[in-house]
Amino acid sequence: TLMARKDLPINSLKDLVTFAKANPGKLSYASAGVGSGQHVLPAALWHLAGADLIHVPYRGAQAAYLDLLGGRVDLFFDLSSTARVHVNAGSVKALAVSGAERNPMHPDVPTIVESGVAPLDLESWFGYFVPKKTPMDIQDRLRSELAKVIAQPDLQETFRKAGGKPLSLNADQTRALVRRDV
């Protein structure tokens, strides 16, 4: 979720990019450090949108939040599950989410693509992998057992509450996902 400090006079990603293009280097965005997800995702967004913002790297997300909430930086992109607390409290404004679809935690917040500023669709995902030479019968058993775990209603609900979408992909689907995203 892309968050803006609550007193920033911008209420949409489209307006933010318009302002940033007209005022290069005037807006800043925090990250949890150089190379972190909170750095790479917005850097890609600003690049694709043709906007020049100042990157302010912190040593972790907590320090970035302190300065966003204190109004010392303008923007911060973080996981929706973490951002939710601050968005719901009204201490920041949510401008966009990075996934292909709106996030259930922030159903009124448009995606980056919906905002029309960049063709950017990025989501975090986790997978289980085994060495290439693992026998197929072991791979099949692991896949089957993991699918049973992922299908459990309590686990599904835990993922949803945290803003996640639990998926159980077969080998071909997983290979396609890795080829697309990695």
Question: What label would you give each PLM region?
Answer:
Residues 1, 96-132, 169:
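Periplasmic-binding protein-like
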Residues 1-63, 112-114, 125-158:
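Hinge/capping helix and adjacent helix->loop/strand transition within the periplasmic-binding protein
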Residues 6, 79-81, 99-100, 132:
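Short secondary-structure boundary segments
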Residues 12, 57, 71-72, 91, ...:
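Conserved functional loop/turn residues at catalytic and ligand-binding sites
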Residues 16, 54, 91-103:
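Conserved helix-loop-beta element of the AMP-binding
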Residues 20, 44, 48, 62-72, ...:
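Short helices/loops that flank or line small-molecule/ion binding pockets
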Residues 28, 74-78, 93-96:
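Paired acidic/hydrophobic, glycine-rich loop segments that form the ligand-binding mouth/hinge
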Residues 170-182:
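Extracellular/periplasmic bilobal clamshell ligand-binding domains
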